[in-house]
Amino acid sequence: MAISPVLFIGLIYLAGGGSLFPGVEAIWLTVPESGERCVYEEIQANVVVVLDYICIDDAFTQLGPTLDVRVTSPYGKELYKIANVTHGQAAFTTSESGTFLACLAMHHDQSHHSVNSSVIVSLDWKMGIRAKDWDSVAKKEKIEGVELEIRRSTEYASAIRANILYLRIREAYMREINEKTNTRVNQLGLMSLGVAIVVSISQVLYLKRYFLKKKLI
């Protein structure tokens, strides 16, 4: 039995806990002394997101680097902003689908100036099932063992269904865009052909009149 591409991608998406790269737990990146580094993630609407970050002072100096961190929505709304920190956690629930941006920069002011020329940062996006604190759920609802695993598996199954439906909607949307684009290209092609035919006929008639006037034919 063949597995459709949509189902295959959905299963990979679930296996990664909301990411298309299941083996990646965190992103390691270098933030320069000036400017900022941004990381983006495509996230659906109504998804719980937890972003953990920590900067590493590889020089082990007392004046270690600190960060300015901000997270923005697809429409540019600031969901999280903090300055002069070495680590932290941003948590929010998405209200729209799209590209969410996390930007980091080294903090500089008169009271704190790092001797580092750059800083290494560990950045970990957790979404949906991965963002859920199952230990807290187990304590709050007093469930453990097999019952907890069944609860977790049920939510994973619901996530699979939601992700597959989302991917199917995106697939249908992209197919509609492609069909509209193809239709417009065909229309423009026919218009161009019509214009070329009209111009060619006009040129032939003009040349015919010219040759008749000059009595060349």
From Swiss-Prot:
Task: Set out the biological process GO terms recorded for this chain's protein.
Answer: protein transport; vesicle-mediated transport
Side Cytoplasmic, residues: 208-217
Q: Which residues lie on this side of the membrane: Lumenal?
A: 27-186
Q: Which residues form a coiled coil?
A: 138-160
Q: Which residues form the signal peptide?
A: 1-26
Q: What is its main location?
A: endoplasmic reticulum
**Family of this protein:** Belongs to the EMP24/GP25L family.
Record-annotated GOLD domain positions: 36-152
Q: Which PANTHER family match?
A: TRANSMEMBRANE EMP24 DOMAIN-CONTAINING PROTEIN
The cross-references to Pfam families, in alphabetical order and at most eight, read: EMP24_GP25L (PF01105)
Question: What is the protein's name according to its record?
Answer: Transmembrane emp24 domain-containing protein p24delta6
* Gene Ontology terms: cellular component: endoplasmic reticulum membrane
Function as written in the Swiss-Prot or TrEMBL entry: Involved in vesicular protein trafficking. Mainly functions in the early secretory pathway. Thought to act as cargo receptor at the lumenal side for incorporation of secretory cargo molecules into transport vesicles and to be involved in vesicle coat formation at the cytoplasmic side.
* Classification via PROSITE patterns: GOLD (PS50866)
Could you list the residue ranges that cross the membrane? 187-207
Q: Would the keyword Glycoprotein turn up in this protein's UniProt record? A: yes
Give the multimer and partner information.
Probably oligomerizes with other members of the EMP24/GP25L family. Associates with the COPI vesicle coat (coatomer). Associates with the COPII vesicle coat (coatomer).
Q: What is known of its domains?
A: The cytoplasmic C-terminal domain contains a functional dilysine-retrieval motif, which is involved in the retrograde Golgi-to-ER transport of the protein.
Subcellular localization is given as: Endoplasmic reticulum membrane
Q: Give all Omega-N-methylated arginine modified positions.
A: 170, 175
UniProt motif COPI vesicle coat-binding: location: 210-217
Which SMART domains does this chain map to?
EMP24_GP25L
| Membrane topology label | Single-pass type I membrane protein
Motif, COPII vesicle coat-binding: chain positions: 210-211
